[in-house]
From Swiss-Prot:
Catalyzes the conversion of 1-hydroxy-2-methyl-2-(E)-butenyl 4-diphosphate (HMBPP) into a mixture of isopentenyl diphosphate (IPP) and dimethylallyl diphosphate (DMAPP). Acts in the terminal step of the DOXP/MEP pathway for isoprenoid precursor biosynthesis. Keywords: 4Fe-4S, Iron, Iron-sulfur, Isoprene biosynthesis, Metal-binding, Oxidoreductase. Binds 1 [4Fe-4S] cluster per subunit. Residues 1-284 are annotated as: 4-hydroxy-3-methylbut-2-enyl diphosphate reductase. One of its GO terms (cellular component) is cytosol. The gene is ispH. This is 4-hydroxy-3-methylbut-2-enyl diphosphate reductase. Isopentenyl diphosphate binds at residues 40, 79, 129, 224-226, 268. PANTHER family: 4-HYDROXY-3-METHYLBUT-2-ENYL DIPHOSPHATE REDUCTASE. Its EC number is 1.17.7.4. (2E)-4-hydroxy-3-methylbut-2-enyl diphosphate binds at residues 40, 79, 129, 168, 224-226, 268. It comes from Fusobacterium nucleatum subsp. nucleatum (strain ATCC 25586 / DSM 15643 / BCRC 10681 / CIP 101130 / JCM 8532 / KCTC 2640 / LMG 13131 / VPI 4355). In the N-terminal section; belongs to the IspH family. The active site is at residue 131.
Amino acid sequence: MEIIRAKHMGFCFGVLEAINVCNSLVEEKGRKYILGMLVHNKQVVEDMERKGFKLVTEDELLNDMDELKEDDIVVIRAHGTSKSVHEKLKERKVKVFDATCIFVNKIRQEIEIANENGYSILFMGDKNHPEVKGVISFADDIQIFESFEEAKKLKIDLDKTYLLSTQTTLNKKKFEEIKKYFKENYKNVVIFDKICGATAVRQKAVEDLAVKVEVMIIVGDTKSSNTKKLYEISKKLNDNSYLVENEEQLDLSIFRGKEVVGITAGASTPEETIMNIEKKVRGIYKMSNVNENQNEFSLMLEEFLPNQEKRVEGVIESMDQNFSYLDVPGERTAVRVRTDELKDYKVGDTVEVLITGLSEEDDDQEYITASRRKIEVEKNWEKIEDSFKNKTILDAKVTKKIKGGYLVEAFLYPGFLPNSLSEISDSEEKVNGKKIQVIVKDIKMDPKDKKNRKITYSVKDIRLAEQEKEFAGLAVGQIVDCVVTEVLDFGLAVDINTLKGFIHISEVSWKRLDKLSDNYKVGDKIKAVVVSLDEAKRNVKLSIKKLEEDPWATVANEFKVDDEIEGIVTKVLPYGAFVEIKPGVEGLVHISDFSWTKKKVNVADYVKEREKIKVRITDLHPEDRKLKLGIKQLVANPWETAEKDFAIDTVIKGKVVEVKPFGIFVEIADGIDAFVHSSDYNWVGEEIPKFEIGNEVELKITELDLNNKKIKGSLKALRKSPWEHAMEEYKVGTTVEKKIKTVADFGLFIELIKGIDGFIPTQFASKEFIKNIRDKFSEGDVVKAQVVEVNKETQKIKLSIKKIEIEEEKREEREQIEKYSTSSSEE
């Protein structure tokens, strides 16, 4: 069976450093506490408990704070802790060893700095995770969310500036989606992306491996956030993915019939656990408690510091590339020393050496072996002790990079230089042979063998000592020389000799600087003034702009509300434009202050960056450094005269500026539109007009709403309606002959003019009784009827056939009467 390890897996340097911190404290006096789980791994935690550490929660520590003594030790876990715990520990003056991961510390520091400088914080992470609980306690104004859906629901104030940050162990792909959303939708959100590099590469490594193997094993504590994320990623790509804490949880049946197995592990998983998993898979599982680093270190000590045997003096008789041979009185054979130990000697010189034994059996000739190096090592011990006691600086050389740090040699004394004390960058590749300066941090001797000395070196302590000296020499208001080390979105990180300083973007210039990288680069030498000093954190905050006079100091004397002035546009944003009215003094023209009449304003249509424009001051508060400007205030508000200019029934011409399916908008004055609904285009029966933008039209004002600044107009109101025409033509008594348009159960409809029908009720359709009107009339029949009623309110005209018939009948009767009357007279 082939077992393939992920390219990146297991202990990250943050976890390793936390474990190294605890291991270095095992022999210290006093009670030893670890705040929370040192790392999310039961085996590591249990190992620490066996070594004398007691695990306590934050609540337990705070409750028992009064019982802590000055020689007690508290180790802060890799995930960090809350601000209140830090402050309480500082008050108690106990020995605190902060093993917080540097990525977590970096995020915490950036959030704290940003919050102090007025930024609101947006933080993505699991609010119940100990890392998140600790980090967010350092900010007052903060919103927490866990998903893209929650991010979209956040309340973002466009007048505020935000810092977006994240939990270090978050899924990098998820945060990339969040970053993209905020970049595309908000210009006032600064993104601080510090997902742990170890987390990101481990997630990428498991993605690459999961698709290449038949079974994927993820090793780690089930409570570990980064371990669970590795499992989730693997499970999506390979359904045969299993999360186990140790070899005891491993079910060998899952490997039945499988040939290729992949293994990865969380950042808190020991190498021993991973190896035990591998051994069980191969069927050769057995426990191993080898400490790789310690063995390597011990072997090196044995190589250079064997038990002393005998010192002798001899004359160098010959030297070759590998060995030199000495004549030592009293010895039965030549004494052989490695030539590289006698670089400062030549043939004929007398030299003192230490006898170490006999040459190997396979040598052609037997020699007594000796060492000059070990003599020199003993002579240099005073320098090592002096460095330990008085912190004197030693020249040293890196001999090898090992897990957790480096093997270093100073005055022939090898020792261990932990990563946390090395000041050597992780990205630095060629470190073997690197010359450095160190001090001795610690010496441990074996009581049974005083030659077995374990030395811990430190580079960091040299810097801290120099920093302490330099920090003591600083004062608020002092001008210092700095070198830019990092250009961030919200400030400049600088070096002041050995000290670190920070210049927030708001302290760089009195002028607006949206992108510091346009003005500064790494390596720039600048001057700045010290504005605050934090002795506890060795933090130095500086200002460049305070080297010059505050331009706001004279604003009250130079400007007042209602002044019309010229300025330069410095920034165009969706919600307005910033205009500089003098160097270092800016005001905002809000989007609502560009036009009296336009409801939808595109700021970029009005102004461009670096353009000189005229503005009016609408609000000014120099003490708060607030200035509001307006462009529309330069001209009169046309709505103030709208009641007179656009009174109801006013006929006015304008141009079509927008065509919608439901109507048109007509500009009747600069920036003032009237809306004409499609139902007001034409009367029934008239041709429906078509409009294009730019068409000139005439309309009549039908509605004026000054409160909501709305005007409605009508095109058809310019002409008489069909009803008005009908009223003029069809008065009561008018007789018409028209075709029947519709036959209904209750009467007849005839079209008088296009769009206006007349109605003949059934009872008016004939003088005779009509049982079924459809039997008597059909659509298309021409009938003669008389208008009997015109109702203006309902706009209805009623007619009668019956009245015509009765009148005709009466006329015929009169004619007959007249006829017979005439005949009788003649007779």
